[in-house]
Amino acid sequence: MSTLDIAEDNKIKNEEFKIWKKSIPSLYQHISSLKPIFGSGVDESPSTLRSIVFTNDSSCNKSKGVLSVPLLYSQGSEIFEVDCIVPLGLHYKKPESISEPLVQPDYTMESQKVEQTVLIPKWEFKGETIAKMIYVDNSEINVKVIALSTNGSLAWFREGVKSPVYTMMEPSTSLSSASSGNQNKPCVDFAISNDSKTLTVTKEKHLDNENATIKLIDNSGKIGEVLRTIPVPGIKNIQEIKFLNNQIFATCSDDGIIRFWGNEIGKKPLWILNDSLDGKTTCFAASPFVDTLFMTGTSGGALKVWDIRAVIALGDADAELNINQGHNKVNELFKVHHFYSEQVSKIEFSSISPMEVVTIGGLGNVYHWNFEPVFAIYNEIHEDFQGIISDELEAESMAFYHTEGCRREIGENNKVNTVAYHKYIEDLVATVDSDGLLTVYKPFTGKVLDGSREVGAAKS
């Protein structure tokens, strides 16, 4: 696609955004956008890599009827803190849990303060480009956030100290030579164990004689020390890594295989999930509520729900043998789909509701799911359930669809870390677009009581 074609496509999407902006806000419990103002010297070009993550902090102003929810926003090597102003009471799960009447929100003064504030970097990972952040607020090591750069280096940041207090550095590698073939899509990821004592970091293969690797990093005693390095031969990169608990973590690589690893067990996976149907597997997530529930997403837009016990039973004997055999002989519990076969790039379970999940498409669109209707059917007809659900049930499970008037599709940057899902405020989501526009919203799902069942869904 030529530069002129891209410009024309973006122009059309901007016009669609203007139409959406006028008509759609009624489908949200709350939605607001902010274009931050930065001090001099900040690189604001659309090609600059951006990522966002919510903190766990919040502060309320009862007289104004508003809640301030901080968001960390990385742009290039710098991290900024942005106050997101939302209505007081948005953090309540149900209206009946509100103990006293709430003041009608007055955004004027509070929003203007935020909009007119010139942001200066709170932290800086000098000489690096930040790809992802994890908010930890770990009092034991006195660290607020850990940042991963595009070449696999790590930085630990402390409140009130602009430079990292700890680092784990990797040799500099030109993004243009990355095996992913796209300078805007560095294939690095990291994760933290449930007890916060261990980090895992991936590094992609750059030369023919190299392997993609996983490093286990100390996050409690000798912070930043490499505990183990695991080479993963036969692949170019690992696009996602997550802990299932303190001892087991899993990876998803460019060959579409999910590998499960033990913290202290050898250099081969314990089990694998090799699912080649519905496109290549691109991402995964494990439920924080049900330890047997596991989800994967594919390049063809399928979101699959698995019983991890079946995966373990199949892959327990010889993981490497199963890789060579191709598709695993295990079936998912059920599957649903993104619109227009949009690739599933990220899956995130709610930490509040066991049935709710947010998924991110390859174009940046955000899907909100509530699988309560599916599991209700599954429990009723468990013996006869074959993993195939009706179109009506799938539509009911998709609670909300956020496109920002197709604005989320503008730009070529990796969209995986441009969406943040709040840990404690149900359904609160933030997005950052390629031009730096921040949007914070909580969807109105359109559900109304109909006897004992809730029906309806909203799309935007």
UniProtKB/Swiss-Prot annotation:
GO cellular component, one term: Rpd3L-Expanded complex
Main subcellular location of this protein, as a coarse class: cytoplasm
A Gene Ontology biological process term: meiotic cell cycle
Signal peptide positions on this chain: none
Protein induction: By glucose.
Gene Ontology MF annotations: histone binding; transcription corepressor activity
Cellular compartments annotated: Cytoplasm; Nucleus
Keyword tags: Chromatin regulator, Cytoplasm, Meiosis, Nucleus, Repeat, Repressor, Transcription, Transcription regulation, WD repeat
Renumbered ranges of motif NEE-box: 14-22
WD repeats: 233-271, 276-316, 339-379, 411-451
Domain of life: Eukaryota
InterPro entries reported for this sequence: WD40/YVTN_repeat-like_dom_sf (IPR015943), WD40_repeat_dom_sf (IPR036322), WD40_rpt (IPR001680), WD_repeat_RBAP46/RBAP48/MSI1 (IPR050459)
Subunit field text: Component of the RPD3C(L) complex composed of at least ASH1, CTI6, DEP1, PHO23, RPD3, RXT2, RXT3, SAP30, SDS3, SIN3, UME1 and UME6. Component of the RPD3C(S) complex composed of at least EAF3, RCO1, RPD3, SIN3, and UME1. Interacts with RPD3.
Further facts: Present with 3040 molecules/cell in log phase SD medium.
Domain notes: The NEE-box motif is required for the association to RPD3.
Function of the protein: Catalytic component of the RPD3 histone deacetylase complexes RPD3C(L) and RPD3C(S) responsible for the deacetylation of lysine residues on the N-terminal part of the core histones (H2A, H2B, H3 and H4). Histone deacetylation gives a tag for epigenetic repression and plays an important role in transcriptional regulation, cell cycle progression and developmental events.
Name the UniProt record assigns to this protein: Transcriptional regulatory protein UME1
The gene coding this protein: UME1
